[in-house]
Amino acid sequence: MKESQINQAFEYAKARYADLGIDVEKAVEQLEKLSISLHCWQADDVTGFENGDGELTGGIQATGNYPGKARTISELRADIDKAMSLIPGDHRVNIHAFYGDFGGETVDRDQIEPKHFQSWIDWAKEKNYKLDFNSTCFSHEKSADGFTLSHRDPAIRKFWINHVIQSRKIAEEMGRQLGSKCIHNIWVPDGSKDLTVDRLLYRKNLKESLDQIFEYKTNDDYMLDSIECKLFGIGSESYVVGSHEFYMGYGVANNKMITLDSGHFHPTEVISDKISSLLLFAPEIMLHVSRGVRWDSDHVVILNDELQALTQEIIRANALDRVHVGLDYFDASINRIGAYVVGVRATQKALLQALLEPIAQLRAYEANGQNFERLALLEEAKSLPWAAVFDYYCLKNGVIAGEAYIADIQQYEKEVTSNR
């Protein structure tokens, strides 16, 4: 796409939106400030660097066997760098605890330290990325029976408590060195395949474990904790300890950020509808944007109705400073760098559309009970020239606009990933 064509289309878009009282330049400036947290685990199918032959557990599954997945830290970072080069703006990288730079040593989860992630911090500093972090309470012998922080065995619980505390120390150090608050997310797979009698016991154990974890105080200037629920997983269809109600209650009672994952609810339930309620009670919200197809399948994010509804809720609530956007999917059936770029660009497009929404007029219609007018304008807004604005945003950031990035990824595959 020629630069002159992009600029010409952008000028038309500016004029068209101006007719509706919308400042396109301001919307672009706002989008420029929005960082999306890119999940490192798409690049290697959630394998990590503890044990390359280890099995992915925790009721999650990466399906597909597309060639070229990252096998080492250097390959994974190179793939992320490539994806970032095709995504406009400055963004974050989200790391799980079993992606440490262990130097060939066996380091158990309760023994991880900031030194095992110093090379990640150095890389992020060099590339101008910021980092987020996650405890990894799955794919480990001490999570094999499906329970971690809620385990009946106090010794098992203590192991995972120590792991999460160590993870929080790492997140704090990441935030300190990079000058940006690192969000540390806690998700545990705890649950049962079939009918569970002592449901209260496990939830009491989880609450007490979290209480012990948060007794270790961290600096809020460097890191923030977030807690994540789930409805069910493979092997935990009947009961999940960390339900939405559990974490919503714990988060509100203890002033903790709450993570909402698009795929962690019933297929007919959407997290966009939860944003406005949680904003009234929780200090902040972390989003793990995914695309579940019939279950929590973690398909690549696309520009669908729910993604648009999700970003609209954030912008309409004027909550950009309280809602953090991260991605969480892992499709092993397609080019993994392509999966990154498609998902992040889709999320950015949805955010841009929301920023360009004629919200003042829509609110006026709603307040006056003009429901036909509201519906009509919502529909017309869908076909406004937002895509021309996104192309301009790409151009402004020195990133390929339009579908031309496909060929760039194909070339990288030919030269790099196909040789693995």
Regions found by a protein language model. Give the residues of each.
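Alpha/beta catalytic barrel-like cores
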Residues: 1-152, 159, 168-169, 176, ...
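Acidic/histidine-rich catalytic cores of soluble enzymes
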Residues: 195-306
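Extended substrate/RNA-proximal surfaces in nucleic-acid metabolism proteins
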Residues: 168, 174, 180, 203-210
